[in-house]
Amino acid sequence: MKQILFIFLFIYSLNVQAKVVLPTIYSDGMVLQRNQPIRIWGQAAPKEKVIVTFAGQQQVVNANTDGHWETRLSPLKEGGPYELQVLGKENQIEIKDILIGDVWLCSGQSNMQWVVNNVTNAEVEKKNANYPQIRTLNVPRRMELVPIDTINAKWTVCSPETVGSFSGVAYFFAKKVHEETHIPIGIINSSWGGTIIETWTSLEASNSISSEHLNCYTKEDKLLSPTKYFALKNKKAARNDYPSLVYNAMIHPLLSLSIKGVIWYQGENNVGNAEPYTDWLTCMIGDWRQRWKTELPF
């Protein structure tokens, strides 16, 4: 009986792995950045042919030996809604109600994390929040020692029923821009209360910071490498213990999405060590711009 069960589970796992898969950030109601190439990627069986269809464009790609595949579609002007279809050998994925507009990354600590439910006159704001062309993606708050590529999050369309969980700063920004431009607005809320700027900065960029500004992290090492971390007996670490921990989990997975710019609301937790903040902010902004390959407005 156990042998039969094992064979069944093995065959089932092969069928699951053979299906084409998209990251969850490609979900119903998403907003893609206008006037920039659109990157679509996912997983499939090794060497599997994948057909991607979107807004009158179609691309055929083959997954590599690891099952990874990706393609880029031509830029589009603002508009929609569109439907994304991804066809593999075993299954087809359909993502609906996609808009093309401006996508803003909204990041920082508690002031950015503060939700509409907690603002002054919240009930009035929620009652009037009928903005179907404003959508948000709330990035889960977590940290990782090394950069990861995916997050478990889906887009949410703004409505009186949903807006309460939107970042207040991000929502009021999106509302103002949308009312002025009449362009769909996507807001990616990647924020975490109590964080310092260092944890939002990649490890590579942190290495460019003056050594005198890194003394607060470890006595023996200015930066803790993944190898040294895994060698520790006690692997417990808080989000502010070392540079890059939050960047790895909450910024790096977003690099596949083109964005218009960044709203940054952070600094309170660096007030006790304000002198090097200018260096860290300059470093982080430069690093994010380099990774998105554009001079993002902050």
Question: Model-derived features: where do they sit?
Answer:
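Positively charged n-region of N-terminal signal peptides that target proteins for export
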Residues: M1-I4
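Cell-envelope and extracellular/periplasmic
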Residues: K19-F298
